[in-house]
Amino acid sequence: MKKVALIGASGYVGSAILNELLSREYQVEAMVKHPEKIKTDNPNLIVKKIDVSDKKSLEEALKGFEYVISAYNPGWANTRIYEDTLANYPKILDAAKKAGVKRLLIVGGAGTLFVEPGVRLIDAGILPDAWMPGVKSLGEFYLNTLLNESEIDWVFFSPAGNLGDMGAKGPGKRTGIYRL
C-alpha cells in the first residue's frame, strides 16, 4: 500500500487532497495543528497533531516517509500569514530533508504562474488585496528558497488561478478535469 504524509490536511486544499488520497487507497498520515477538524473516518487514515513551527518534532514525524505533501497554510484570515508562511515553509523543507524524505510536493499558489508573457498572476492586478500576503509569501518561498534547493526532489504545485473561493463556501467539488 502506498503511504504518504500530508501536512495541512484539514485546510481547504489539504482536505481535498486527503479525500483524493483516501479514495485512491493510499495510507495517509494527516499532520495537522487541529486534529479535531479532521472528520473523516477511514482505516487508511492516521491523524497526528503537529506544529510545523517545531522543526525537530516535524522531522521526527516525517521519518520513514518517502513522500510528503505539504498543503500547509497558516490561514487566509491570519493577519500574520505572510510572516508565518515564510517562517514555517523553510522548516518543513529542512525537516523533510533531515528525515530522509525522497520527494516533497508543496502546494503553492497560482501567483507565480504567468497569465501572459512576462506577467505573473500576482502582478496582474486581479487578485483580491486580502489574498496578497499569502500569495506573495508562497511566491517568495518558491523563488528565493526552492529554486536553489538541490538536496531533495521537490515539486511546487501551483493550482489553477480559479481554484475556488478559498473555502468561504465550504470545500470545492471534485471535477476530475485536472490531473497531477
State where each predicted segment sits.
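Conserved catalytic-site region of short-chain dehydrogenase/reductase
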Residues: A77, G111-E116, N162-M166
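Conserved beta-strand positions in the Rossmann-like core of class I SAM-dependent methyltransferases
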Residues: A5, E29, K48
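Short, polar loop motifs at secondary-structure junctions
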Residues: M31-K37, G161
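NAD(P)H-binding glycine-rich loop region in Rossmannoid oxidoreductase-like domains
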Residues: E36-K91, A95-A99
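Conserved beta-loop-beta element that borders a ligand/cofactor-binding pocket
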Residues: L143-D165
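Conserved Rossmann-fold NAD(P)-dependent oxidoreductase catalytic core, especially the SDR/UDP-sugar
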Residues: P35, P90-P133, L147, V155
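A conserved pocket-lining segment of Rossmann-fold NAD(P)-dependent short-chain dehydrogenase/reductase
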Residues: K173-L180
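N-terminal Rossmann NAD(P)H-binding glycine-rich loop of SDR-like oxidoreductase domains
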Residues: V4-R24
